[in-house]
Amino acid sequence: MTTVWKVLVLHGPNLNLLGQREPGIYGSLTLGEIDACLREDGVDLEAEVSTFQSNSEGQLVTAIHGALGNYHGIVFNAAAYTHTSIALRDALAAVQLPCVEVHLSNIHKRESFRHISHIAPVAIGQICGFGLNSYRLGLRALVDYLNGQADS
């Protein structure tokens, strides 16, 4: 029997404005289109994908806590909170679920304050700069990681 992995995709602040917000940086796809693509990819990867977006740091912390016992892993675009939130970092460390950090833009080619990630030290990996494919590759990497853990 094949395991169907349960994956939570979390989107941080301002990502609800995708498609309108700075399309030269973030692309023209809406968050709904990204979520639909990830759910579709999930079918092929034998992963059940759930998504959640919030502009509130506290709601994202609560979602991470709620993932414990309900999901096998997290794909997380913490957006601006990547660079500022110790609370999100600590929540991820507390639940100890494998997490892949993703970003639509290459945070390392942008302003220097964006080069710092508080999420990366508690994530299994980081993918950035590939637009929608950052999410898609992040989901695939997480499922590959989970499959590897199940095999060992």
From Swiss-Prot:
UniProt pathway: Metabolic intermediate biosynthesis; chorismate biosynthesis; chorismate from D-erythrose 4-phosphate and phosphoenolpyruvate: step 3/7
Keyword flag Repressor: no
Active-site residue numbers: 26, 103
GO terms (BP aspect): amino acid biosynthetic process; aromatic amino acid family biosynthetic process; chorismate biosynthetic process; quinate catabolic process
Bridged cysteine pairs (disulfide): none
Protein name: 3-dehydroquinate dehydratase
Family: Belongs to the type-II 3-dehydroquinase family.
Catalytic activity: 3-dehydroquinate = 3-dehydroshikimate + H2O
Enzyme Commission number: 4.2.1.10
Annotated site (Transition state stabilizer): 21
Role of this protein: Catalyzes a trans-dehydration via an enolate intermediate.
InterPro entries referenced in this protein's UniProt entry, alphabetically: DHquinase_II (IPR001874), DHquinase_II_CS (IPR018509), DHquinase_II_sf (IPR036441)
Keywords: Amino-acid biosynthesis, Aromatic amino acid biosynthesis, Lyase
EC top class named in words: lyase
Pfam families: DHquinase_II
GO molecular function terms noted in the UniProt entry: 3-dehydroquinate dehydratase activity
Amino-acid positions noted as binding substrate in the UniProt annotation, renumbered to this chain: 77, 83, 90, 104-105, 114
Organism: Synechocystis sp. (strain ATCC 27184 / PCC 6803 / Kazusa)
